[in-house]
C-alpha cells in the first residue's frame, strides 16, 4: 500500500499523468469536432445531467460498470443518454512492460459493452501513445479495435520541437522531473503542440 501511495505521489508518476492527460485532451477536441459534424453527442469526463458523477460509466448486460474515456452517442444530449455508436479509449505508457496489461484493461472495459450493444454495432477505437509492444497493439486489432498509435519517440520529438524535454529513463531523478513539470506549467503554446503532433503522426 505504501509503495502505491509513494508511486502515485512521485514526480515521475505526475509527469506521466501530464503527458497522458495532454494526449487525451488533444483527442477530446478532435472527437468534439467530429461529433458536431455528424450530429452526435460526445460524452467525456466531467459533469452531465444525464448521469451521476464526473465519470463516463456504462453498464454491461451482466450489471458490471465500466469507466470509459469517450463515448459517441446518437440522440444523446446533456440530459439524455443516447445510443452508443463509438467507444474510444486513450492511454499513455512509458514502458512496454506495462503495455499488455493496459491492452487487457481496455479490452476488459469495452468488449462486454460491445456485446451488450451489438445491435448498434458500435465502433471501437483506442489512441495509444508511448511504448506499446507490437503484441499489445495486435491483440487489440485482432478484437476489432481501430488503433491510432503515437510512438514514444514521436511524442518526445513533438515536445522537443517546443523546447520541452519530455523523455525519461528508469533512473531519471526527481529533480529532473520537477524541472519537466515546471517547463510544462510555464509552456503557453499547448495548442500548437497539439496540432504539430497530429500533423507528424
Task: Show the residue positions of the predicted features.
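Phosphate/oxyanion-binding active-site loops and adjacent basic polyanion-contact surfaces
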Residues: 19-27, 63-67, 95-105
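Short, charged/polar micro-motifs that form catalytic or ligand-binding hotspots
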Residues: 13, 17, 21, 60, ...
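Catalytic cores of nucleic-acid endonucleases
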Residues: 81, 85-86, 90-149
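Residue-level detector of flexible, active-site-proximal loop/helix-junction positions
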Residues: 47-51, 94, 154
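Active-site metal-binding core of divalent-cation-utilizing nuclease and nuclease-like domains
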Residues: 43-81
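Interdomain/boundary linker segments immediately adjacent to catalytic/signaling cores
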Residues: 1-48, 200-201
Amino acid at each position: 500500500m505504501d509503495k502505491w501511495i509513494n508511486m502515485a505521489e512521485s514526480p515521475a508518476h505526475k509527469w506521466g499523468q501530464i503527458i497522458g492527460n495532454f494526449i487525451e485532451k488533444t483527442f477530446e477536441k478532435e472527437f468534439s469536432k467530429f461529433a458536431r459534424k455528424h450530429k452526435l453527442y460526445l460524452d467525456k469526463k466531467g459533469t452531465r445531467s444525464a448521469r451521476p458523477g464526473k465519470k463516463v460509466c456504462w453498464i454491461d448486460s451482466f450489471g458490471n460498470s465500466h469507466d470509459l474515456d469517450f463515448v459517441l452517442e446518437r440522440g444523446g444530449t446533456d440530459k439524455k443518454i443516447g445510443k452508443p455508436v463509438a467507444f474510444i479509449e486513450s492511454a499513455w505508457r512509458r514502458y512496454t512492460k506495462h503495455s499488455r496489461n493496459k491492452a487487457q484493461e481496455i479490452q476488459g472495459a469495452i468488449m462486454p459493452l460491445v456485446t451488450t450493444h451489438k445491435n448498434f454495432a458500435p465502433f471501437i477505437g483506442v489512441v495509444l501513445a508511448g511504448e506499446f509492444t507490437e503484441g499489445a497493439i495486435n491483440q487489440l486489432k485482432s478484437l476489432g479495435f481501430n488503433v491510432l498509435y503515437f510512438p514514444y519517440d514521436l511524442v518526445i520529438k513533438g515536445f522537443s520541437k517546443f523546447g520541452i524535454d519530455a523523455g525519461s529513463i528508469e533512473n531519471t531523478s526527481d529533480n529532473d522531473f520537477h524541472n519537466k513539470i515546471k517547463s510544462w506549467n510555464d509552456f503557453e503554446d499547448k495548442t500548437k503542440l497539439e496540432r504539430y503532433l497530429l500533423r507528424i503522426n
